[in-house]
Amino acid sequence: MVVAGDSLVGGASVVVVVIGASLVVVLVVLVVLAVVVVVLVVVVVLVVVGSAAWRTSATAGGAGYNTGRTEGSAARAATTTLRRTRDAVSPTCKSLRNIPPCWHLATLIARHPTSTFCQPPRRPRDSLRPMTATGSFDASRFGLLTEIVDQQSYRRSVDRCRQQGIVLPTFAQLADPSSIPADITASLADIDRNAADPLNLFRVHWYNDLHGGRTDLPEHVVLTPELTGVDSPIIVAFGNRFPMIGAHKVLAAYACLVPRVVTGQYDPTEHRAVWPSTGNYARGGVAISTLMGCRGVAVLLENMSRERFEWLEEWIDNPDDIIRTPGSESNVKEIYDTCDELAQDPANFILNQFTEFANHVGHHEVTGRALERLYLHHRESNPGLRLAAFVAASGSSGTLAAGERLKSDHGARIVAVEALECPTMLYNGFGEHNIQGIGDKHIPLIHNVTNMDGVVAVSDRACDELGMVFNTDEGRTHLTGDRGVDDAVVATLGHFGLSSICNVLAAIKTARELGLGADDALITVATDGAEMYGSEREAMAAGRYATGFGSAEAAAAVDEHLAGADTSHVEMLDEVGRNRIFNLGYFTWVEQQGVELDDYEIRRDQGFWKGVQELAPVWDDMIDEFNARTGVRSGS
C-alpha cells in the first residue's frame, strides 16, 4: 500500500511540473507578442507622423542641396539618427524643422555635431558684447570688434591722421549733419566736393546738393501716377549727391574702414585696403582710403562700365592697384577667388562689403534715418500717409539695412530686388545681366534674410531701354508731351542710373502686388546717376537702336516697362520662403568661404541683428576718442 501510494504521488508531481512549465512557456510567448505589438505600433506612428513632418519641411530650405556628396559612415549614421529622432527634437528647433531630410543635412550634422541644427534657437541678445565674449561669433573676422586689439597699429593710425590733418566723422554726425562742428562746416564751403581732401569725409551723407552744399532735407523726387501708372507716391532719394564718386557706396566704404581703424585692426603704415566690388564700392573704397591716408586697391570685374575705370585711373597712381577680374555683374565668385589670393600677403587687408557687418550698420544708422526724414516730411502735408514698403536692389545688401529701421519704426515692408536674368533669391537662378551694382549670384552674409518681406525681379532690358528714354530728348519729350509727366519730374530722371531705374520698376510692381493706394508711400534710392552709364547708352544706340531712337521707340519702351510693369516675378515671403533663401547662402559661405556653421546659423535670430545695429554709438565713442588723441580738431 505504501509503495502504491508513493507511485500515485510521484505521478501527480510529474503532471504538476509539466503543467507549470507549459504555463511559463505560454506567458513568455504572450509577453513576446505584446512587445512585438508595441514595437509595431511605435514604428507605424513614427512613420506616419514623421512622413507628414518631413513633407511639410521639404518645402523649405531645399534650395540647391547637394544629394551627390557622400561623407562615409558618419553621414550614414547621422541620417539614421535623424530618422529615429526627428520627432523627439524640441518643437522650437526651427532650423531642423525647416530643412529637408537629405544626405547633405546628414553630412552637416556629421561635420558639426554641436551645430545649431539640433539646438533650440539662441535667446535674443540685447547687445553684441555678450555674444562676442562667449566666442560664439567671429567678431574679428567680420569687423564687429568694440575694443582696441592692437595698440601699436592704433598709435600709428593716430599719428598718420595727426600728420595729415584727418578728422573722422561719427555715424551720428553723418546721420544728422547739423551736428557736424561749425568750424568743419565752414571749411567745407571752400572745398570742392570731388577733391581728395580729408574734410570731404564730412560730406559722406544724404544731405548734399549737386555742388556740395548742405541741404535741410535729402534731395529726392516723388514719382507720380503719370509716370509710374500707380496711385502710390514713390519717393526716391538721390545717391549721386554723395562726394567724390557720385554714388552712395562711398558711405558703405567709410562704414567698413573706420571701425577697423579705431579698433587697431587696420594699420595704414603696413596695410593696403583691398576693395572687392562690382564697381561703385571699389571707387568709394579708393576715395575713402585716400582721404584717410591709406593705400587703396580696387578689385572689380573687367566688364563694368568704362566710366568706372576712368574714375579709378584718375584717383590711383599705381596701375597695379586696379585689379580686373573676369566676367560681368554676376561673376562675384571670381572676385572672391582673387581676394583669396591677395589675402595670402598679410599686407593686403580685404574689406569685403558682402561680409563686413559695418556696411549694414552704416546704412541702418545713416541711410535709414535719412529716408525716415523724407517720409516724415511728406507725412506733414498728408497726415494719413503710411509707409508701405522700402524697396531696394541687393548688391551687398547694405542698403537694405535702411529698411530694418523703417520696418521697426514705421511698419514698412522690406522688399529686395534682383535682376530677372539672375534671379537668385526668387528662383535660385543664375545668369549674367547688366544692372551694374546688384545681383551678384549669391546671398550676402550681411543680408538679414529672415526679416525680409518680398522679392521682385526686374529685367536688365527694361533698365537699359528706360535709360535711353530718360536721357534722350526724344524720350523726355514723349514723357511730357504724350504721357503728361510734369516737367519738374522729367528733369530729375537723369539722376537715375541703371540700378536706380530697377528700384523704381520694382516699387511699381510692389505697389500693384499689394494693391496700394494714394495714401501708401513707397520709398527707394537712386544709388547713382546716369552720368556713370554714358558708354552703356552709346552701346545701346549702336546695337539695339542702330536704326535710331525716336518717339516710337520711346513709346514702346514706356508701354512695355512702365505701363506694363505687372505683378510677374514678385513673391511676398512667408517663413518657408525666407528660410529657403537663407539656406541657399550656406553653399557660398560655409562650404566655399569657410564661415563657421554656428556663425552662419546665428544670423537667423533677430536678436543677433539687433545687437549689430546697436554698435554705431559704441563705435562713435571710439571715433571721438581717436579724434581726441590726434589733436587735429575736437571732432565733436
Show which residues each predicted segment covers.
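PLP-dependent amino-acid enzyme catalytic core
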Residues: L128-S636
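Short, positively charged and aromatic/hydrophobic N-terminal segments
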Residues: Y65, T107, R111, S115-T116, ...
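Residue-level detector of structural "landmarks"
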Residues: A53, A58-A60, G64-A78, L82-S90, ...
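Polybasic, low-complexity intrinsically disordered segments
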Residues: G50-S51, T81, I99, H104-H112
